[in-house]
Amino acid sequence: MPTHIADLELSTPLPTLTLQSHERGLFALLRWHGRPVGLLRWPQATGTLTPAQVQAAITASAQLPALPSAPAPAPISATAPLSIIICTHERPDDLQRCLTSLLPLHAARHEVLVVDNAPRTERTVTVARQFPFRYLVEPRQGLDHARNCGLHAAQHALVAYIDDDAVADPAWAAALAAPFTDPAVGCTTGLVLPLELATAAQERFELYCTNRRTFQLKRYRAPQTPPAAAGVAGMGANMALRRDLALTLGGFDPRLDAGTATQSGGDTDMFARVLDHGATIVYTPDALVWHRHRRSEAELRHCLFGYGVGLYAFLSKRLLEQRDPQALMIGVRWWGGPIAKAAWAKLRGQPALPLELLAQEAAGAWFGALRLAQETRRQARTTVVPNTN
């Protein structure tokens, strides 16, 4: 049964929540004066929930600081404008929802670019023309080709990326840009939460994400964070970069990520090279997007397999092309990590991603180096020039 998703502000009286008859369970974002501070997961919730019941559930289960005595945080200050890039491939319904969420940001001086990657139909351009945004075509298949297309076409000094199946929170752009007032910061990332939990596959993917998010601001810099471990810094669904730094680094590696044999890893590779360059990556939970997780079991399995492929394609690149010994160490340690943690959680009776799904990610890892080699050979034969008009 679908889980009800709510957005609760703790500095004001809590509302009465009414779950639909087909819903069971509550997933609620908790805010303090607009800032995300925690989550409430209440699997048994049904029917009408009074403010007292919701408060009791928050008190019993949510991990929060002592908010009632905490002062209101300072508002996020206005920052330099962003070039917001959405790379998309034949997902018009998702794109429509994403672009609608970006309309207020466009009105606030931010530039929005829609990059149509290897289009097969007119569905994407039909949606894009409904909005006052720039529309670009990148004929070469691959997410990192599309990211680079937007990067080169962007007009502002800061470029932000959001997935086409995500929705931006109203404060997203300002929060993602705010850390760049520090000249040492080269990249920022933010919080990703589920847009819906309507299927079993989405619930299972949420278990996968649970231990990968935090509500604390984080700063990552080498050598404290080895570049080979840069995946801890965030996700490509919600990131921003200094444009000149990204161009200096050569842009995103087109051999990696969706639309290629490696399936993922392009964001992690960029984070690693930002750290190599000596710049800082800042993760801020104030920069929030809501992401539509994969709805079907087949999509979920394909996604997790691709995560394994992309991770080991990235680590293979670090080891073989950049001679980074940390990549080998991290690659070896990874095998015991996720599966061992899931098994331990199950033994303790805690929610955990089923081991057969973690096995999908592990299976993909075996193909990482091979897929990187295949994609390198394939792209060596590709000479199409992108259209950025």
Model-based region annotation:
Residues 171-208:
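Conserved donor NDP-sugar-binding/catalytic core segment of glycosyltransferases
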Residues 190, 208-231:
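Short, flexible, basic/aromatic active-site loop/helix in glycosyltransferases
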Residues 303-309, 323-389:
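Non-catalytic, C-terminal membrane-associated alpha-helical segments of glycosyltransferases
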Residues 159:
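Short aromatic/hydrophobic "clamp" motif used to bind/position activated sugar donors
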Residues 2-24, 28-40, 44-101:
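N-proximal low-complexity "stem/linker" segments adjacent to membrane-targeting elements
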Residues 233-250, 255-287:
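A short, conserved alpha-helix in the catalytic core of glycosyltransferases
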Residues 124, 138-154:
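Glycine-rich, basic loop-to-helix element that forms the pyrophosphate-binding segment
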Residues 100-109:
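Short, acidic, metal-binding catalytic loop of nucleotide-sugar glycosyltransferases
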